[in-house]
């Protein structure tokens, strides 16, 4: 048995992306846009099939009418909320909206039933539409890879990602949630891929062979320098950093020769490695991902490999981790943990993993206040930037009002005061500043200088806020991963619950708290990211082959573990502690939940 791991390395921030990489990223972006267009056409064709049946068409007309009515009522309710300054306004439209939405839900259910009744009859037509979509996707391969310059592995990766997105959207729609593929503008970001194909007679794709630039089987696709882990583990930190500064060479599509033929292209990527794959790892692929951070582009490389299983861990305590977010003196509590044995928390993590008992068997996981403070500071910088945008907009509108419309640099529509008044994004003003910097409009040297001065100041604020916020959030993510690595290193089993953080957060929107308070709570929850903590813990446990048990979240807060009484579902759980109706004692819902999680996990593993 094997398990799949992805080892990520950061690309040097001063690396200048070659034009060949930009070309491949743009082709991958265009491919995704074409796939989205094909999916739109496929959905329209399927809808046309269902609409061809009179019973379904009649229900679709009813759904459209009710949907329009619900939108009108929702707008009225929104206006009343603003006018009455409450989340629950007193107005007839509120009841009408609830009734209309109920009718809309029933009409959609009736439409699904009508579709189900004619599905067998429409099977052949649907199969034809599906075959046409598959043929169109194959034609895209010929256009982009056979006749074009896109690398085939990147095509496969984009197509796989697209199919995954389509499945996710179908699952959301099945649950009654709105979901739709969308087109995206090109912003210089994306991912290219390399796949290492292996025949049965080929040698194993070990790190040593992939690192061999002279005789390696796959040297024409990927070269990743490698140090044996036995040697790596003996190095000190400085030696590891020096040995980890390497250049990865990977295939990056093709270029077109003057005679029309194609030539394979490679790129050299400087990275910083922090760990090495085992000697018996089987490397299958590599991905170079470019993301935007402010005005800059940052890149990372991920190496995908299969690693032989070493067998599940069967020693160590069982640790239950219950998610939740509450404010504390030291930060935001994102989870409560309980262990069946005492834990010796490392000194470096004692500010994040706290203990609440002398036995060191229960405690909390805290995101320190300093992370939230850093994010808040950079949000303040971003707000100053927004105010500066308002000022430059007013200045430009006043100038255009006085001097009249100006010709667009390459579009037929002129730049008018009315159109600029609608501009919201800073990038539009920055674009105009760059256009007028070298060729200002007639009598517009002053406004061109004003725009350029604003652009320079805005770029500085943009970089400061985006890079600062990114560093703060990466600090939080690193703390989550350190906590996850520690728990996976000491636990014999990890227990988590299946709480839906998004659903809980959505429910919180309907609270009676003031809107500003709700926003502050939501902002702190997003910064603390309890869902990311759970994902990190599960990923670390999977990596280290620690058994993981997921228990139901139902009743974890309502049931008092000490007496077993299940309290009613009301608003008492928003505050700590909670009064139990069964025994009359108060209890901490989070601590009680961890006891219940251990009990449920024990029952599940014993069956």
From Swiss-Prot:
Its cofactor is Mg(2+); Zn(2+). Part of a type V-M CRISPR-Cas system. This is CRISPR-associated DNA-binding protein Cas12m. Has a bilobed structure, with a recognition (REC) lobe and nuclease (NUC) lobe. The REC lobe (residues 1-315) is formed by the discontinuous wedge (WED) and recognition (REC) domains, while the NUC lobe (residues 316-607) is formed by the discontinuous RuvC and target nucleic-acid binding (TNB) domains with a zinc finger domain. The crRNA-single-strand target DNA duplex is bound in the central channel between the 2 lobes. GO terms for biological process: defense response to virus. Zn(2+) binds at residues 560, 563, 580, 583. GO terms for molecular function: DNA binding; metal ion binding; RNA binding. Belongs to the CRISPR-associated DNA-binding protein Cas12m family. Residues 391-452 are annotated as: RuvC insertion. Residues 74-83 have a biased composition (Basic and acidic residues). Has been repurposed to perform A-to-G base editing by fusion with the TadA-8e adenine deaminase and tested in E.coli and in human cells. The small size of this protein may facilitate its delivery by adeno-associated viruses. Mg(2+) binds at residue 590. Transmembrane segments: none annotated. Residues 190-315 are annotated as: Wedge domain (WED-C). Residues 589-607 are annotated as: RuvC-II. Binds crRNA and target dsDNA as a monomer. CRISPR (clustered regularly interspaced short palindromic repeat), is an adaptive immune system that provides protection against mobile genetic elements (viruses, transposable elements and conjugative plasmids). CRISPR clusters contain sequences complementary to antecedent mobile elements and target invading nucleic acids. CRISPR clusters are transcribed and processed into CRISPR RNA (crRNA). Binds only 1 Mg(2+) as opposed to 2 usually seen in other Cas12 enzymes; lack of the second Mg(2+) results in loss of target DNA cleavage activity. Binds 1 Zn(2+) within the target nucleic-acid binding (TNB) domain. Residues 552-588 are annotated as: Target nucleic-acid binding (TNB). Keywords: Antiviral defense, DNA-binding, Magnesium, Metal-binding, RNA-binding, Transcription, Transcription regulation, Zinc. Residues 316-559 are annotated as: RuvC-I. The gene is cas12m. Residues 50-124 are annotated as: Roof in REC. It comes from the Bacteria.
């Amino acid at each position: 048995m094997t398990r799949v791991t992805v080892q990520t390395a950061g690309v040097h921030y001063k690396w200048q992306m070659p034009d060949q990489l930009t070309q491949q990223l743009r082709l991958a972006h265009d491919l995704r846009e074409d796939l989205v267009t094909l999916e739109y056409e496929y959905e329209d064709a399927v809808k046309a099939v269902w609409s061809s049946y009179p019973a379904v068409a009649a229900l679709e007309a009813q759904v459209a009418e009710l949907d329009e009515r619900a939108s009108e009522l929702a707008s009225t309710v929104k206006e009343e909320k603003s006018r009455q300054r409450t989340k629950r306004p007193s107005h007839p439209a509120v009841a009408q909206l609830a009734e209309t939405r109920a009718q809309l839900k029933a009409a959609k259910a009736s439409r699904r039933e009508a579709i189900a009744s004619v599905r067998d009859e429409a099977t052949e037509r649907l199969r034809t539409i599906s075959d046409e979509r598959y043929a169109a996707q194959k034609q895209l391969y010929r256009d982009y890879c056979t006749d074009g310059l896109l690398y085939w592995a990147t095509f496969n990766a984009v197509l796989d990602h697209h199919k995954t997105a389509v499945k996710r959207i179908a699952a959301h729609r099945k649950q009654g949630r709105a979901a739709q593929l969308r087109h995206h503008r090109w912003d210089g970001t994306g991912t290219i891929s390399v796949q290492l194909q292996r025949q049965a007679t080929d040698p194993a794709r070990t790190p040593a062979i992939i690192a061999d630039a002279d005789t390696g089987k796959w040297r024409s696709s990927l070269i990743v320098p490698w140090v044996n882990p036995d040697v790596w583990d003996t190095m000190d930190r400085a030696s590891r950093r020096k040995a980890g500064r390497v250049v990865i060479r990977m295939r990056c599509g093709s270029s077109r020769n003057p005679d029309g033929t194609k030539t394979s292209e490679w790129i050299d990527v400087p990275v910083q490695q922090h760990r090495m794959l085992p000697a018996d790892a089987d490397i299958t692929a590599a991905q170079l991902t470019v993301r935007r951070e402010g005005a800059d582009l940052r890149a990372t490389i991920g190496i995908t490999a299969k690693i032989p299983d070493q067998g599940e861990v069967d020693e160590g305590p069982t640790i239950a981790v219950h998610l939740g977010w509450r404010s504390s003196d030291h930060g935001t509590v994102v989870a409560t943990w309980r262990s069946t044995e005492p834990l010796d928390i490392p000194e470096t993590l004692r500010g994040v993993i706290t203990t609440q008992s002398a036995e060191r068997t229960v405690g909390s996981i805290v995101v320190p206040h300093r992370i939230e403070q850093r994010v808040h500071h950079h949000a303040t910088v971003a707000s100053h930037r927004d105010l500066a945008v308002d000022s430059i907009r007013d200045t430009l509108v006043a100038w255009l009002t006085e001097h009249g419309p100006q010709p667009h640099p390459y579009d037929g529509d002129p730049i008018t005061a009315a159109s600029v008044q609608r501009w919201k994004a800073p990038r539009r003003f920055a674009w105009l500043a760059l256009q007028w910097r070298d060729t200002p409009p007639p009598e517009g040297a002053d406004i061109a200088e004003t725009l350029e001065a604003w652009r320079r100041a805005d770029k500085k604020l943009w970089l400061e806020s985006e890079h600062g916020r990114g560093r703060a959030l990466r600090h939080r993510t690193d703390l989550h991963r350190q906590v996850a690595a520690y728990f996976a290193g000491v636990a014999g089993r990890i227990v988590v619950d299946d709480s839906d953080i998004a659903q809980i957060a959505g429910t919180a929107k309907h609270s009676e708290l003031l809107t500003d308070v709700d926003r502050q709570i939501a902002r702190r929850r997003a910064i603390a990211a309890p869902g990311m903590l759970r994902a990190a813990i599960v990923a670390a446990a999977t990596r280290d082959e620690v058994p993981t048990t997921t228990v139901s979240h139902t009743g974890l807060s309502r049931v008092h573990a000490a007496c077993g009484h299940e309290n009613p579902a009301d608003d008492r759980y928003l505050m700590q502690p909670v009064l139990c109706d069964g025994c009359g004692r108060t209890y901490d819902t989070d601590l009680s939940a961890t006891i219940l999680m251990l009990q449920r996990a024990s029952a599940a593993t014993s069956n």
